[in-house]
From Swiss-Prot:
GO terms for biological process: NAD metabolic process; NADP biosynthetic process. This is NAD kinase. Gene3D superfamilies: Probable inorganic polyphosphate/atp-NAD kinase, domain 1, Probable inorganic polyphosphate/atp-NAD kinase, domain 2. The lineage of its organism: Bacteria, Pseudomonadati, Pseudomonadota, Betaproteobacteria, Nitrosomonadales. GO terms for molecular function: ATP binding; metal ion binding; NAD binding; NAD+ kinase activity. Keywords: ATP-binding, Cytoplasm, Kinase, NAD, NADP, Nucleotide-binding, Transferase. It is found in: Cytoplasm. One of its GO terms (cellular component) is cytoplasm. Its main location: cytoplasm. The gene is nadK. NAD(+) binds at residues 73-74, 147-148, 158, 175, 177, 188-193, 246. It catalyses: NAD(+) + ATP = ADP + NADP(+) + H(+).
Amino acid sequence: MQIPFHTVGLVGKYDNQGMEASVRALAEFLRGRGHAVVLACQTAEHFGITDFPTRNLHDLATESDAVVVLGGDGTMLSIARELSAHGVPLIGINQGRLGFLTDITVDHMYDAVDEILSGQYVAEERILLKGQILRGGERVFEATAFNDVVVGKGGSGRLIDLEIAIDGEFVYSQRADGLVVTTPTGTTAYALSAGGPIVHPTLEAVALVPICPHTLSARPIVVSGRSRIELHLTYADDARVHFDGQHHFDLQSGDHVWITRANRPITLLHPHSYSYYDTLRQKLHWGKKL
């Protein structure tokens, strides 16, 4: 049985041209279709929208049956991390560039959102990662990632020496520009550029993709999504760990980065006609003459 969607939350990217018109129009459309519409406080304040109730993100997730995110993939990454603990499903309207996560175009948003909220949808559960940095045995930083956790070099441009263990078992050491630890969702992001595999987003798996390793034998590996991945920085003159490219923490030699699956997945809702492979063909231009 499909879940009912009475209350719908709206979140819009603030600095996107045309976003105000899209947020207003979609809110009016949903209200006209009988839904209770709630806007994120910052979205409403930024655009000066006063004729709809507003909530902070925590309360928005708690009170909404679904949340529509208008923006690009970066906006969806940020909102997904914020709301993942609440279990509210997300619908993505693309007003960015790529649109792997926000797969519905503005031109089709009325029909697509109406279709989803009427119960005709494809639901995907996607895992997130939790990363912790330990220094001298004490936790000094932690964050979550929807796409990836990336250990990379900083401004000095020097290589990083890493030892990698999975579930307490040593796997290998590497000297490289860094390492991408990615969810299946993130395999079409930075990991793809680093030569990693494309993993179907509903799989419970994690890929480890070296960035410019100083060896000819290094290859990406895919492990269980329930694995505990431990990265030990044996030498790091200038290194950082990045979470979805939106949060970072400076690392030192001797630091340990522990990465596990986050406690709760995020659920994305797509129109009934959605196809992941069609998205790959469109976004990666498969089969087109270059």
